[in-house]
Amino acid sequence: MQAFYKLIYNPRINLVLRSLIKRLLPILPKGLKIPIAGKFTIENKQGKTLIINTNQTSYVSRLLYWEGYLNFEYSDIFIELIKKVKVFYDVGSNIGYYSLLAEMENKNIKIIAFEPASGPLHYLKENVKLNNFKNIQIENIALSEKNGIIEFYEIKNQKYSYLKHNLAGEGNAGSKTKHRNFVPIKVKTKTFNDFVEEKSHGPIDLIKIDTEGTEHLILKNADVILSQMKPIVICETLFNTIEAELEAIFKKYDYEFYNHTENGLQKVNTIVRNQDDGVRNCFFIHPTKLNFIDNFIV
């Protein structure tokens, strides 16, 4: 089976297969939307092109290619919001999609991309180089509740055992260590406050944070940032996980909650839910920054 995988996920062969499938999609089963291996491109409305290199373990790449980048998460809002931003922190950058999109849309922006996992880090660096981007600073550390060294858990992909780099996106700092084939590695950690104090990139306008369940631990140690800079924070809010912890942190600094829905950003009084309503991301907005997103509020 490994020989078969090596064949269809050879970048050149994969390009031919997916191009053919895309043309025949109207008459083919949806299950034939194969994972992507190698390079693919994203083109914005102004004709600017973004190159992304990936492998078949990246679910993000699969969605971007088959569904279109404007249909991925909150991309349609992000590309308009990022044009107003001077400093963007991408915490849990993975292969760099949002960092790359940010520089494509805003050539004057400063981007700090954090990625401690070795597989995503490899492709993040490669994608920045492929696009000849100069404004993305890559940090191979994990933001955490303390400074030092921790065990970071990466997934060893059993299906594609021959691959060196896994992009499953579930690497984490200890929030998930069971029921999957996790391998621990040592990574350097910094608190958010300490990192920003040491690096001093200026006031942060926007933070996107997706760290597989440790977001609240990172943000607990971002009190100086949240109280003084008041950045917009886009955070994954999966049902029945850390919603209460996130809500408590942001309420302390008078933030408002805007859930991302298919129609836009919907203001809610609480992000804690009794049942899963399908919301996966929340925009945490301080009232002083509402002008950044007022066009998207429904």
Map each language-model feature to its residues.
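Conserved acidic-Pro-Pro-aromatic motif
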Residues: K39-F40, N106-A113, T191-V298
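Canonical radical SAM enzyme core domain
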Residues: A117-Y123, S144, F239-I242
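Conserved SAM-binding strand-loop segment of SAM-dependent methyltransferases
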Residues: F133-N140
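Conserved acidic residues
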Residues: A142-E145, T191
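Polar, low-complexity loop segments and adjacent catalytic/binding residues used for recognizing
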Residues: G148-Q158
